[in-house]
């Protein structure tokens, strides 16, 4: 099995340190051997794990590397996810970066919609809605999410769409000035 995927599985099953080590070993080997097939995806998987483990600054550095790879290679397949993760990293780093985080997340929504990548648009819109809720901006928090959620015609039993529905309900019932 690919060390990156093995690391991801270990990470998700609770072996965070071992999982991160496996992923980092794979990324380092890919860098050494100039292996570039889906390298942006691999970097983003690693960045997501770093972010989940609380290593926001390190995750942000890995996302920056992925964004650079996307720019140089011209491969735009994971561009929206890179923008979403950049926004998530900034949001996790605190108040001073919230406006910039919102811009990155809005960009992720726009890119994924332009590409017709509805699942990525949903993920980005959920991140943007959560950020706006956390900032007490309930009025516009769910606008993009409602639009994207309404575009789905199937899959309503999937975790992503169920989570989106719950978030929309939380936004609708939230009091102004309070978190969703």
Protein language model regions, located:
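Helix-coil-helix junctions within alpha-helical repeat/solenoid scaffolds
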Residues: 1-180
């Amino acid at each position: 099995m690919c060390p990156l995927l093995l690391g991801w599985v270990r990470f998700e099953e609770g072996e965070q340190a071992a999982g991160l080590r496996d992923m980092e070993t794979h990324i380092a080997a890919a860098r050494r051997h100039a292996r570039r097939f889906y390298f942006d995806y691999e970097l983003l998987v690693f960045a997501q794990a770093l972010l989940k483990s609380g290593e926001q600054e390190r995750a942000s550095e890995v996302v920056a590397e992925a964004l650079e790879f996307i720019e140089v290679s011209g491969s735009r397949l994971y561009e929206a996810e890179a923008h979403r993760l950049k926004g998530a990293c900034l949001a996790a780093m605190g108040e001073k970066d919230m406006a910039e985080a919102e811009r990155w997340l809005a960009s992720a929504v726009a890119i994924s919609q332009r590409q017709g990548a509805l699942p990525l648009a949903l993920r980005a819109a959920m991140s943007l809605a959560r950020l706006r809720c956390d900032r007490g901006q309930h009025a516009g928090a769910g606008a993009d999410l409602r639009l994207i959620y309404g575009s789905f015609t199937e899959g309503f039993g999937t975790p992503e769409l169920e989570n989106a529905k719950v978030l929309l309900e939380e936004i609708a019932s939230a009091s102004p000035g309070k978190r969703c």
